[in-house]
Amino acid sequence: MSDISKLSGCGTALVTPFNEDLSIDEAALRRFVEFQISEGINFLVPCGTTGESPTLSDAEQRRVVEIVVEVANRRVPVIAGAGGNNTAHVIKLARECERLGANGLLSVTPYYNKPTQEGLYQHFKAIAEATTLPIILYNVPPRTNVNLLPDTVARLAEIPNIIGVKEASGDISQIAEIINRVPASFRVLSGDDSMTLPLISVGGVGLISVASNELPAGLTRLTTACLENRWEEARRLNRELFALMKLNFIETSPAPLKAALAMMGKIKEVARLPIVPVRPETRDKLRAALRELKLI
């Protein structure tokens, strides 16, 4: 599964399980990847925001990618997170991910230093020139304070190994404009579970999901129903899953997600600062939602 040029469907933005001493829980990670694949997920995305990549050292990021690639064993593509606001450092990460056997990269827009659209273009162009791996851009303005605009996405889509964008702007008009501006082969994916249905309805091809950590089969069914134009079923699934989608962000992600996965017995409820445990009332809401979906 090395060719992701036609990537579609649902991929999980994987959590990174930790032990109580804050080290990576490698055994839990291995089990979790196997769980995801057994439930029918289409691809895996380690070391993104949900994986707490800002708090992982370079060595830890390499180890997480190495484990996920090893356990996946070519059954599903592995698209490794390799982003940041230091272009030279991102290039280093990208090359490491390529060496470790990742099938592609997910690279978030530079945050905090607020580059211009030309700066964003040059940043991603430099990364693309430094690796042979296919790259999926990641636009998430609520987190980065910078918006990758349709003009810039269209320019970047001309670079051969920039093959898609994970869009989490929440602006369906912007997403539709991107889809209308890029080649048909360019992969536009939702970066927000709750935007999957509208994004695919205007021509998107899939989802990089947070909620699929808890319910990979359910989010895969939703995405597939949308892609196959089974809109009545898609709307029903969206209604069933919507509460969980939103609860995962009721406090700073991935704290609610890790609390839910701990209730499900998948991982320990351990995150690294500055992420802190959820409040008791949030825990109660999560427990109720998981029971409603028969996940606990």
Where in the sequence are the language-model features?
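Active-site beta->alpha loop and helix N-cap motifs at the rims of alpha/beta catalytic domains
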Residues: 3-12, 17-145
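A general structural signal for well-ordered alpha-helical segments in protein cores
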Residues: 29, 61, 65, 90, ...
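Alpha-helix N-capping/helix-start residues
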Residues: 20, 26, 58, 150, ...
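Alpha-helical structural signal in soluble globular domains
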Residues: 63, 67-72, 96, 100, ...
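C-terminal alpha-helical cap/extension of soluble enzyme domains
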Residues: 2, 6-17, 35, 39-41, ...
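Gly/Ser/Thr-rich beta-alpha loop segments that engage phosphate groups in nucleotides
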Residues: 11, 50-53, 83-85, 166, ...
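Catalytic alpha/beta core domains of metabolic enzymes, predominantly
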Residues: 129-130, 141-249
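Short secondary-structure transition/capping segments
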Residues: 56-59, 92, 117-120, 148-150, ...
